Amino acid sequence: FFSSILDGIEQTANEAGYNILICQTGEDVQKEIRSVQTLIGSRVAGMLVGVSKQTAQLHHLQEVLDNSIPLVLYDRPCPSLPCDQVVSDDYMGAFNAVEYLIQTGKRKVMFMSSSFQLEVSRRRYQGWRDALMRYHIPIHDNMIVECDTRSGAIIATPRILQSEDRPEAIFCVNDDCAAG
């Protein structure tokens, strides 16, 4: 996912006469904060940031704006920040995917999610839930499994598929879960 984003960013930046600096944080919020502070100190012309899963406080990103550095967020929305944001319509994506599964005859569609602290997880959950509700399919607690890593999904999936009340389909909130 991120490599295809970087290809587009690099091509567009080069065409406009800019070079790019890449800071990978590995979903580590402390690395994210240090990287942002380093880039501010380097007086970059702008920043494109995909915030980590654990980013709850946005002070370091507000500091970017306070220094009049253009900021664009991608992937995970932060509605409280007054900057441009490029994100998917997580709600409709989930709704449409689950509706498709229902229309192909699947009625027991499990939701495998990362933490509900993430806006993306909440929106995808709402899309999943609303699709089931539209088709009058009851939602039970055992239809929701919290898991946001490939290794976690590798452990959880066999247990889910061997259960008596196993789902007919699993909607995964991210690629890591789906790969597990």
Residue positions per predicted region:
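Extracytoplasmic "Venus flytrap"
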Residues: F1-S3
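Bacterial carbohydrate/catabolite-sensing allosteric modules
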Residues: G8-L21, R34-R43, L58, L65-G180
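A short glycine-rich beta-strand->turn/loop micro-motif centered on a GG-aromatic cluster
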Residues: I22-G26, G50, Y74
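Short beta->alpha connector loops
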Residues: G26-V29, S52-A56, D176
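Intrinsically disordered, low-complexity polar regions and short flexible loop motifs
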Residues: M47
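Structural motif
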Residues: G50-S52, S115
